[in-house]
Regions:
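Extended, helix-rich architectural segments
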Residues: 1-142, 147
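Short, intrinsically disordered, charge-balanced linker/junction segments flanking boundaries
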Residues: 150-157
Length: 157
């Protein structure tokens, strides 16, 4: 059973599977590996064909890299009005290697259509009243094939 069959069985409405086929197509362009473009056959005579791979400059990847470098680079500064909050956020971003991973995932966003940065609390301790005593804020980085929106309203997931 694939994920879409599971969603259907549980009566969960999500993005149609055809969208994920498009993501796979975009990824093949990004990797310079489009089946009907980068691969072709050459007739060798006497009924023989040779399968060939077209050379590529990898321009789709280059465009995605350039887009990512414009969006998230060393000149980008994330600022918050409150100094204490800004220090905390900067520390979380540094601990999660955000400038490097964020740029890498901006490239993947340009290639596949979307990415998600998912913050979560690791190694958390909770008291009897449900208050969080401590923990480490971490960030999961997800790319389009691993994102399945379960609900959205007015464009917000």
């Amino acid at each position: 059973m694939n994920i879409f069959e599971y969603f259907k069985k549980k009566d969960i409405d999500t993005v149609d599977a055809s969208f994920y086929r498009k993501i796979a197509e975009w990824d093949s362009w990004y990797r310079s590996n489009v089946r009907k473009f980068h691969f072709y056959r050459v007739y060798g005579g006497q009924g023989t064909w040779t399968r060939c791979r077209r050379h590529s400059l990898g321009m789709a990847k280059k465009v995605c890299e350039d887009m990512a470098d414009l969006l998230l680079n060393e000149r980008v500064k994330i600022t918050i009005g409150d100094a204490t909050t800004e220090d905390f956020v900067q520390d979380v971003l540094r601990q999660n290697n955000f400038m490097t991973k964020g740029n890498e995932y901006q490239e993947r966003k340009a290639a596949k259509g979307t990415v998600a940065y998912v913050p979560y609390l690791a190694d958390a301790e909770v008291d009897d009243q449900g208050n969080i005593l401590n923990g480490i804020v971490k960030i999961n980085y997800l790319e389009a094939p691993n994102i399945f929106p379960l609900s959205w309203e007015n464009g917000k997931v």
